[in-house]
From Swiss-Prot:
Cofactor notes: Binds 1 Mg(2+) ion per subunit.
Any one GO cellular component localisation term in the record: succinate-CoA ligase complex
Known pathway: Carbohydrate metabolism; tricarboxylic acid cycle; succinate from succinyl-CoA (ligase route): step 1/1
Lineage, top ranks: Bacteria, Pseudomonadati, Pseudomonadota, Betaproteobacteria, Burkholderiales
Organism in which the protein naturally occurs: Acidovorax ebreus (strain TPSY) (Diaphorobacter sp. (strain TPSY))
Protein name: Succinate--CoA ligase [ADP-forming] subunit beta
Entry GO MF terms: ATP binding; magnesium ion binding; succinate-CoA ligase (ADP-forming) activity; succinate-CoA ligase (GDP-forming) activity
InterPro entries (alphabetical): ATP-grasp, ATP-grasp_succ-CoA_synth-type, ATP_grasp_subdomain_1, Succ-CoA_synthase_bsu_CS, SUCC_ACL_C, Succ_CoA_ligase-like_bsu, Succinyl-CoA_synth-like
Amino acid sequence: MKIHEYQGKEILRSFGVPVPRGIPAFTVQEAVEAAQKLGGPVWVVKAQIHAGGRGKGGGVKVAKTIDDVKARASEILGMQLVTHQTGPEGQKVRRLYIEDGADIKNELYVSLVTDRGTQKVALIASSEGGMDIEEVAHSTPEKIITEMIDPLTGITPEQSKKVAAAIGLTGASVDQAVDLFAKLYKCYMDTDASLVEINPLNCDSKGNLMALDAKFNFDANALFRHPEIVALRDLDEEDPAEVEASKFDLAYISLDGNIGCLVNGAGLAMATMDTIKLFGGEPANFLDVGGGATPEKVTEAFKIMLKNPKVKGILVNIFGGIMKCDTIATGVITACKAVNLQVPLVVRMKGTNEELGKKMLAESGLPIISADTMAEAATKIVEAVR
């Protein structure tokens, strides 16, 4: 789950990380009132969307008068902001953040992310923060510093000092960095975040550090422990199909292809998508119905997939372990009738009650294409949608 910058900064502030004063705004008038309340003399008008690259896309503007704030807010609010993370369709700006301008001297980068390979938390930092951090990582990777933190011990002052020195901090700024990194790590762990990123982390002319941006991703599986974070969710920023799927406890992610996929188990779902691509097709989605799918959930899964006009065929690939093949067969038959299926459907089932499930499909009277292997299933659905 993602949140907006202004929400992320409130979380950082609650952990003692220094951030500029700012006020969210949902209308141009609210933006003007926010600027008046902050007092100036310089403000930054920021688009609030769940994507990076806002500055390059024209979603971050400096204003030096109240009239400037009004003009910039009018330009940004409601615009379709296109960045390298939104895709060509862009994202509509529905919220703004009006913030005090900052004395920017050096723009640094710092983030925390879980490294699954080492089962540790990676503190990633760079002296080259700002809008071009992706290019820095690509062209000069030696400027990206990574320090692994053992979750059993947490981040140590020695590690923080090492990273601070590596990104060019000196004197009192190092002490500030040690304090900031410790607070950032506590924030990361206490909120069950999967990513906390500050870009840029400003070091001003007096050597003081301040987070000028905040990006958070949270582990969706831990949200039950954080109702205060769930309350920050902005459904307008999410794929409507993914929001709908979450209501039925379906793991769904939209993709760009034309073959809908319904699978039980994340690993099998990824293998199924890979096999479709291997045989020349393009998956339209990742969809894991899980081990406790009911006929009702399967029906809803079909409805969600078929709301995508790109879908020209569906592949159902089920391994019956906890999930029984006859249960899936019942769901598939019910779904086909409920949605009046008009696209090709290939079903491959293996495992518990496999023969019963296949018999039910064969006797359903529906034009369902059967397959015994993943390769056969992928081949048949790719041919069917051509």
